[in-house]
């Protein structure tokens, strides 16, 4: 076993930890960190990391961790408004504080809380006691109040790593430690509601103390203090100044009975269980609780069937990567392939982290290697924030290294540990075995197959766009009255707001400069003709630089096709995403976006078949909510937007005009994403009150939709997560947040995820069921983008393939409403979409 950190080596140094302050600081610094059960743990993790950082730098004879007691301190009795301005304690904090105290006890540290006194006073008393007994002292805190304690033997250790010593204090502020409390009394402290002297800031306070040496001497010579306005401020606030001085000075004389030389051994097993419970896998190693890796038991290649595989690629994209190393592990025995590529021929299945990638590379080499168990997929189902092998290894106990054998061992261990965590989770296990694992085989085949690209067409389109971009630039320069760099936001800002005097509608968060974002320009579209031209220029430039020019270079020289990567563990809802290139971001509705789709073509003698789920999210909403009106519309095959408009506006369906239908369509989809009345009023260019009425009439038309949303949010608050029809989860801890904007954002996420995630699950199910039948027919599955599937089939069988695929998608899973799929065929993606 690796030894624990040398916490108690007799080096004559004591560590005092400002527990409450450190916990609060890390609570806000790492907000959003939760376990796979949705339990917030950011303060616990940050506290542990800060402790480790301090302990690694120096050995300590003893460690004391001090917390504020629940009872009010003497300062509250002296000054009723003390700390009155502080925000209420965040609701997640008390539970995490209890966990931090549990951690401190397990580490064997002395934990102190003294009723009637703050942690500062306890720390100060301990520091003076330790100093008097001949110890060196480090106080781990970022609280500036404790700077008054620094001396030759006492230093404040900031969590970021630097020491506050008398020398540091003099260099930074020109103050001696005994002057620090006078300085704090003069300037006050808004965080503690200490008044200080109103109108005196740090610069003036430092100048006064430099001149008079101390607050006591300054007050003795108050009539000689210059300038006059400073003197008058002090006189006007003398009572506040004396109160601030009294409250700022820490007590060093508390009657504490502690033995500085006493130290307890940590509870190793309890600590291990604690860290595993909170999924702090990386901390097991840092606290020395992982068994030292035993020498690997080597065995000859090939490995036995069922072994877990580890591999190392030269780059992330498997179609372009070199296989640098290959190893396998079964029951702790390691098998290394001397020749990685040759070793692939001995495998039938890839079990291990990122199994799909190795299957894709094998396919490139002409080998049919099937991806099997992948701990990444298990971790992703436990918590969709598990998106990388590095993160999964850290979270569940392990390390992602560049060694293929260790990756194989890690895969075996993670698979075992994650299956144990999923015991009893029948829905998640069903998703793993019936959806995600078989889907990885489908995606591996799709990635390896790729799609043909019309490179000559894209090159011609690039020239055309370059000319159009040049023409737009000239038009913008003419309207501006002079040329400038259109790609420089600062120059564009000057032209729009200084020269053309357009209204500045917002500022950037980082710099505070007037924003030239797309949202701002959209709002200014009607204000001046130049804005329309700039927006057009941006769209053309972005699509040219993102797709038209780079796509030809991504065509693989060996296959002559484009091979995007499908990311199975990247989104919070369960949807697939794509990268290298990202095909999800090609605009579907703009003319230029459609022209880019024209570049994706079928092989000679083949046809592309495009299949698109029609209004799948609204159909899923009908099923999940059980709303009879919504269900009836889809069962009777009526147009949902026309029917919604009919109910919203109180007119027969035949009387619904295009504007009414557009309003209803916006509300139908807006409800899914929690669109506010304010946003709806902007979208439809209608008064706010009318938008409120639209939304209310929608919920009157579909009453069970509102009931379902409320039920989903209520369950989410209780359980900490929401789930799809099939049990896929998303943890939403902020559903209980006190801050309204944070809570409302979480609510939008919470009721959208079951709909969007169920739609994603249905698409995945359809792909898994359809894939083997397509292979039997000699057809290929190429792309999955949004709610669409793109296939390639021999022309002679294209109609047969289209009919088969349509049926498979529509019958993916029985719902209360029929699923409907729109089908098209053509020589390229655009014409196949019709």
Swiss-Prot record:
Its EC number is 2.7.7.7. Residues 176-262 form the 5'-3' exonuclease domain. GO terms for biological process: DNA-templated DNA replication; double-strand break repair. Keywords: DNA damage, DNA repair, DNA replication, DNA-binding, DNA-directed DNA polymerase, Exonuclease, Hydrolase, Nuclease, Nucleotidyltransferase, Transferase. Residues 412-834 are annotated as: Polymerase. The keyword Nucleotidyltransferase applies. It is an enzyme of class 2 (transferase). Gene3D superfamilies: 3.30.70.370, 5' to 3' exonuclease, C-terminal subdomain, 5'-nuclease, Ribonuclease H-like superfamily/Ribonuclease H, Taq DNA Polymerase, Chain T, domain 4. It catalyses: DNA(n) + a 2'-deoxyribonucleoside 5'-triphosphate = DNA(n+1) + diphosphate. CDD domains: DNA_pol_A_pol_I_C, H3TH_53EXO, PIN_53EXO. GO terms for molecular function: 5'-3' exonuclease activity; DNA binding; DNA-directed DNA polymerase activity; nucleoside binding. Belongs to the DNA polymerase type-A family. In addition to polymerase activity, this DNA polymerase exhibits 5'-3' exonuclease activity. This is DNA polymerase I, thermostable. It comes from Thermus thermophilus (strain ATCC 27634 / DSM 579 / HB8). The gene is polA.
């Amino acid at each position: 076993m690796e030894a624990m950190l040398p916490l108690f080596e007799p080096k004559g140094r004591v560590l005092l930890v400002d527990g409450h302050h450190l916990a609060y600081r890390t609570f806000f610094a790492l907000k959003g960190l939760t376990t796979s059960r949705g339990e917030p743990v950011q303060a616990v993790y940050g506290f542990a990391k800060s402790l480790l950082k301090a302990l690694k730098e120096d050995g300590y004879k003893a460690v004391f961790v001090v917390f504020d007691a629940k009872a009010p301190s003497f300062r509250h009795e002296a000054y009723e408004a003390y700390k009155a301005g502080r925000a209420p304690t965040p609701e997640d904090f008390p539970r995490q504080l209890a966990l931090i105290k549990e951690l401190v006890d397990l580490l064997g540290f002395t934990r102190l809380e003294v009723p009637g006194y703050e942690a500062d006073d306890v720390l100060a008393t301990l520091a003076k006691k330790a100093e008097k007994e001949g110890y060196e002292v480090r106080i781990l805190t970022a609280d500036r109040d404790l700077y008054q304690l620094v001396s030759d033997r006492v230093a404040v250790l900031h969590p970021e790593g630097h020491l506050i010593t008398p020398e540091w204090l003099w260099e930074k502020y020109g103050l001696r430690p005994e002057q620090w409390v006078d300085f704090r009394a003069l300037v006050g402290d808004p965080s503690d509601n200490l008044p200080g002297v109103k109108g005196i800031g740090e610069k003036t306070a430092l100048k006064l103390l430099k001149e008079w040496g101390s607050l006591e001497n300054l007050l003795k010579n108050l009539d000689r203090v210059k300038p006059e306005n400073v003197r008058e401020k002090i006189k006007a606030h003398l009572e506040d100044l004396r109160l601030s001085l009294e409250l700022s000075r820490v007590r060093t004389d508390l009657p504490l009975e502690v033995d500085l030389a006493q130290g307890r051994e940590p509870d190793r097993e309890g600590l291990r269980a604690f860290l595993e419970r909170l999924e702090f896998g990386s901390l097991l190693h840092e606290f020395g609780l992982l068994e030292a890796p035993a020498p690997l038991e080597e065995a000859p290649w090939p490995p036995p069937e069922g072994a877990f595989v580890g591999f190392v690629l030269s780059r992330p994209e498997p179609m372009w990567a070199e296989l640098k190393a290959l190893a396998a592990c079964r029951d702790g025995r390691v098998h290394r392939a001397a020749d990685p590529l040759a070793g692939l021929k001995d495998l039938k299945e890839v079990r291990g982290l990122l199994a799909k990638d190795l299957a894709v590379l094998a396919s490139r080499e002409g080998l049919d290697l099937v991806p099997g168990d992948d701990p990444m997929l298990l971790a992703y189902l436990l918590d969709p924030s598990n998106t990388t092998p590095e993160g999964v290894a850290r979270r569940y106990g392990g390390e992602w290294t560049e060694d293929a054998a260790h990756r194989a061992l890690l895969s075996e261990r993670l698979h075992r540990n994650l299956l144990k965590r999923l015991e009893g989770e029948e829905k998640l296990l069903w998703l793993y075995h019936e959806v995600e694992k078989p889907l990885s085989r489908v995606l591996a085949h799709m990635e390896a197959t790729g799609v043909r690209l019309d490179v000559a067409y894209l090159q011609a389109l690039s020239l055309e766009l370059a000319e159009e971009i040049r023409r737009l630039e000239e038009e913008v320069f003419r309207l501006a009255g002079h040329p400038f760099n259109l790609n420089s936001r600062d120059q564009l800002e000057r032209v729009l707001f200084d020269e053309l005097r357009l209204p500045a509608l917002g500022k950037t968060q980082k710099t505070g400069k007037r924003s030239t974002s797309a949202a701002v320009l959209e709002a200014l579209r009607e204000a001046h003709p130049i804005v329309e031209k700039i927006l057009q220029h941006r769209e053309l430039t972005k699509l040219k630089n993102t797709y038209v020019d780079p796509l030809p270079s991504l065509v693989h020289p060996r296959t002559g096709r484009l091979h995007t990567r499908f990311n199975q563990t990247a989104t919070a809802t369960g949807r697939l995403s794509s990268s290298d290139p990202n095909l999800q971001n090609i605009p579907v509705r703009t003319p230029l976006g459609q022209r880019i789709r024209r570049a994706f073509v079928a092989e000679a003698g083949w046809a592309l078949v495009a299949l698109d789920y029609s209004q799948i999210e609204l159909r899923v909403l009908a099923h999940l909510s059980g709303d009879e009106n919504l269900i009836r519309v889809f069962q009777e095959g009526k147009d949902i937007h026309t029917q919604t408009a009919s109910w919203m506006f109180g007119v027969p369906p035949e009387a619904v005009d295009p504007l009414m239908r557009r309003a209803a369509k916006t509300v139908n989809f807006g409800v899914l994403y929690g669109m506010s009345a304010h946003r709806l009023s902007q979208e439809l260019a209608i008064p706010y009150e009318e938008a409120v009425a639209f939304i209310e009439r929608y919920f009157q038309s579909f009453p069970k939709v509102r009931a379902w949303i409320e039920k989903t949010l209520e369950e989410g608050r209780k359980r900490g997560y929401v789930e799809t029809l099939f049990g896929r989860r998303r943890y939403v801890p902020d559903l209980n947040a006190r801050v309204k904007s944070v809570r409302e954002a979480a609510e939008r996420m919470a009721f959208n995820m079951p709909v969007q995630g169920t739609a994603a699950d249905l698409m995945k199910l359809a792909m898994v069921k359809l894939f083997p039948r397509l292979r039997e027919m000699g057809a290929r599955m190429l792309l999955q983008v949004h709610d669409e599937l793109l296939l390639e089939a021999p022309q002679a069988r294209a109609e047969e393939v289209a009919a088969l695929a349509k049926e498979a998608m529509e019958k993916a899973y029985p719902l209360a409403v029929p699923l409907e799929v729109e089908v098209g065929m053509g020589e390229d993606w655009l014409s196949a979409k019709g």
